[in-house]
Every structure is written in C-alpha cells, then in structure tokens.
C-alpha cells in the first residue's frame, strides 16, 4: 500500500504532489486553492511509478475541498438562518390571526415574525391558532393559553413559555433551544420532532403526551426535568 506524506500548517495542507491553501474571506467564507506539486525526480520509470500518487494527490485535494465546504456551511447557515426583524407595526398582532397557509407542513407565503413580542397572560387570542414556521426568538408567552395551537417548524429559541397551557396542541418540529418552559403543561400534546436543548423544563407537566421514542430519549437528557416528570415520560 502506498502512503502519501502530508504536512499540515495553519493555513496550508501540502504533500510532494499537491498543496491546499486555505484563506478566510469576509463573512466567514473559506477560499481553497489547490495546486499540483512538481515531480523533481529524474527518469521516466520513476515518473511512471509516481503517477498513481499524483492521482491520489488530486483526489485528496478534492476531498479536502469538500470537507472545507462542509465545515464552512454551518457558519454560513447560522448567519443567514433568520431574516431581518420585520418592521411592520402590527407584526405581533398577526399571531392572533395565525398562519393559515401550509399549516402543519410549516409552509408559508411570508414569515410570521413574533420575535420579542409579549403575549404574557393572554387567555383568548392565541388559543387554537396555527403558528406554523413562526419566528419566536425572545418572545414572551408566560401564562398564556395556547391550547390546541399548531406550532409546526416554529423557531422558539430563547423564548419564554413559563406556565403556558399546551393542552391538545400540536408541537411539531419546534426548536425550543434555551427556552424557559418552567411549569408549562403538555397534556395530550403531540411533541413530534421537537428539540429542547438547554431549555428549562423544571416542573413541566407531561401527561398523555404523544412522543416518539427517539424524541423521548433526547428530552430525557435534559437534567432540569424533575423526578415526577421523568417518571411520567418513562425516562430511564
């Protein structure tokens, strides 16, 4: 088996047959430059014997380019994930109408931008609404009645849902990362594909919750769930 010596530096990866220069551009982009190294050996026989290694160098270079793009992609995606905050004066009130297009599939003609809106203790306007693909970052729903709501593909990172009643709701593929759900009630609630990474699930009520096995395993990793909640969920 032939081996291909490769040297690594901070901005360059090289071997006798190829080199890759990595240069970071503005906006977290990475530029990759590949070049073939010169064969300094003399003799046709030696050149022929090294030819497969040159091909390996080209393949390795292409693989490194693909790897670099893969590494860079999450950074680009993170920077471009959310659109600019809506400047519409009534954007928070649009939650009272909901997003009626696409519904459970989270398809919408225009983002439902509820970021940083305050719906604290709202007992009437949110009940039964469809909030598909809603942007809820930093929003406050503390004490609100959100029974029978449909939240499909909503992005609720760092939002507050303390004491919210989610009875009979469909919480499908919602990102609750770092959100505060202390004392929230998930009774007869569908929790399919939703994530709660670093969320506060203290004193959350899970009663007759419909949840898949894989999703259950992920929720059970959250250490803020009390013993009663873990028992109801069936966490091991």
Swiss-Prot record:
Note the SUPFAM superfamilies from the entry: Pentapeptide repeat-like
Instruction: Give all residue intervals belonging to the Pentapeptide repeat domain.
Output: 124-163, 169-208
Q: What is its main location?
A: plastid
Q: Where in the cell is it found?
A: Plastid, Chloroplast thylakoid lumen
Q: Does the keyword Glycoprotein apply?
A: no
Concerning Pfam families, the annotation shows: Pentapeptide
Which cellular component appears as one GO term in the record? chloroplast thylakoid lumen
The answer on whether this UniProt entry bears the keyword Transcription regulation reads no
Return the InterPro entries for the record. Answer: 5peptide_repeat
Q: Which UniProt keyword terms apply here?
A: Chloroplast, Plastid, Repeat, Thylakoid, Transit peptide
The cross-references to Gene3D superfamilies, in alphabetical order and at most eight, read: E3 ubiquitin-protein ligase SopA
Q: How does it assemble?
A: Interacts in vitro with LTO1.
Protein name from the UniProt record: Thylakoid lumenal 17.4 kDa protein, chloroplastic
- Gene that this sequence comes from: TL17
């Amino acid at each position: 088996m032939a081996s291909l010596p490769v040297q690594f530096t901070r901005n360059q990866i090289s071997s006798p047959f190829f080199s890759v220069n990595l240069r970071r551009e503005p906006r977290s982009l990475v530029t990759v430059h590949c070049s073939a190294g010169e064969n300094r050996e003399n003799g046709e026989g030696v050149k022929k014997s090294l030819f497969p290694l040159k091909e390996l160098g080209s393949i390795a270079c292409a693989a490194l380019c693909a790897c670099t793009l893969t590494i860079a992609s999450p950074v680009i995606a993170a920077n471009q994930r959310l659109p600019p905050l809506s400047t519409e004066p009534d954007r928070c009130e649009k939650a009272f109408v909901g997003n009626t297009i696409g519904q459970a599939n989270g398809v919408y003609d225009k983002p439902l931008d509820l970021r940083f809106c305050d719906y604290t203790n709202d007992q009437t306007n949110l009940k039964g609404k469809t909030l598909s693909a809603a942007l809820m970052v930093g929003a406050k729903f503390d004490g609100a009645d959100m029974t029978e709501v449909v939240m499909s593909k909503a992005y609720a990172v760092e939002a507050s849902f303390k004491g919210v009643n989610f009875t009979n709701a469909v919480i499908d593929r919602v990102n609750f990362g770092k959100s505060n759900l202390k004392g929230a009630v998930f009774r007869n609630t569908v929790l399919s594909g939703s994530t709660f990474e670093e969320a506060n699930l203290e004193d959350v009520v899970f009663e007759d919750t419909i949840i898949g096995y894989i999703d259950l395993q992920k929720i059970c990793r959250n250490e803020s769930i009390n013993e009663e909640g873990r028992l109801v969920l069936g966490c091991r």
